[in-house]
Amino acid sequence: MSEVPSAFFSSPAAGGIVLIIASAAAIIVANSPLREGYEVFLKYNAAGLSVEHWINDALMAVFFMMVGLEIKRELLTGQLATWGQRALPGFAALGGMAVPAAIYVWFNAGSDETLAGWAIPAATDIAFALGVLALLGSRVPASLKIFLSALAILDDMGAVAIIALFYTSNISFLMLAGAAVTVALLFIMNRAGITRLFPYLLAGGVLWFFMLQSGVHATIAGILLALFIPLRVTDPDKQSPLARLEHGINPWVTFLILPLFGFANAGVALSGMTADDLMSPVPVGVALGLFVGKQAGIFGLSLLAVSLGLAKRPEKSTWLQVYGVSVLCGIGFTMSLFIGNLAFAESPLLVDEVKVGVLAGSVLAALAGMLILRFSPSHPSR
């Protein structure tokens, strides 16, 4: 019997399934008599921060560190190590961010307040999207899984840049200076060849504190720390510090941090919303940005890049399969909810509207993408 849970947790789809369960639980609780207790729990103050802030500002910094480790590994030695490998996912990521943002802006052009959410539909949830692909098994060629992974990594890079550049407020230059000194220390440690993880993690904790107090979102500390974790070691028989850290935190991020984030952020009280709320510019812009904008931007620029000879279609794939993956990328969830919380931090109603839009767009994208890939021909036409 013990083999069953072991097989489940080692499955590529496991993380997405656990995240779905946690998010569904949040929606159920938020629309039940337990709602008040749920809200009290999230607002409970512990060591100066609410539980919700500890999850979104501290635990999610660990998630962003894992994203940063993956980005560094793929850029230096993996699927994005050469310009040729970066071409198709690069064009696709560009279209997959620009078109959803444009659709959102089109629906919200009349309001300066809601325009702040333009980046919400620009992100892809790699855990969900790869989880759906895993459910389809061998029907999807390995090249498409690599394409989706590379695209999502570049998407994450764009989302991180957006958070750092556009969702900061009340900058404390003193704290920012402290963060800069800490980054310089990390650089020196890296150049000095220090391979023990503890000094890096200790400096990372200090960096997180400075970022939290600076006005730049604290999760950026996770990305910055990841950039300085050594990838290469002199002894080829030894695992690199980056690989050790990535393998060490992956299960915690997948099965604890992201489900906690989903439970803390997906709970929306639908009973308190009117039809006008559900069809207002924010949820409609987010949902259509994810479901329509993602597939149009990713597939459109992929087709254009291949047609112009700037990139190559993934091996052993059909254009219909590429389109199916483009639709799947409309699963925004984690990063979209995260950006929504930043964009509308002072407006709980707008945050709830974002949740509705993200859930609607992501569910449509998951179902449509899975159906397209399930029934698409598995061999490219000649």
Curated annotation (Swiss-Prot):
It is found in: Cell inner membrane. The chain crosses the membrane at residues 8-28, 49-69, 87-107, 115-135, 146-166, 169-189, 209-229, 252-272, 286-306, 325-345, 353-373. Its main location: membrane. GO terms for molecular function: sodium:proton antiporter activity. It comes from the Bacteria. It is a multi-pass membrane protein. Keywords: Antiport, Cell inner membrane, Cell membrane, Ion transport, Membrane, Plasmid, Sodium, Sodium transport, Transmembrane, Transmembrane helix, Transport. GO terms for biological process: regulation of pH. Pfam families: Na_H_antiport_1 (PF06965). Gene3D superfamilies: Na+/H+ antiporter like domain. It catalyses: Na(+)(in) + 2 H(+)(out) = Na(+)(out) + 2 H(+)(in). GO terms for cellular component: plasma membrane. The keyword Methyltransferase does not apply. Belongs to the NhaA Na(+)/H(+) (TC 2.A.33) antiporter family. Na(+)/H(+) antiporter that extrudes sodium in exchange for external protons. This is Na(+)/H(+) antiporter NhaA 2. It comes from Klebsiella pneumoniae subsp. pneumoniae (strain ATCC 700721 / MGH 78578).
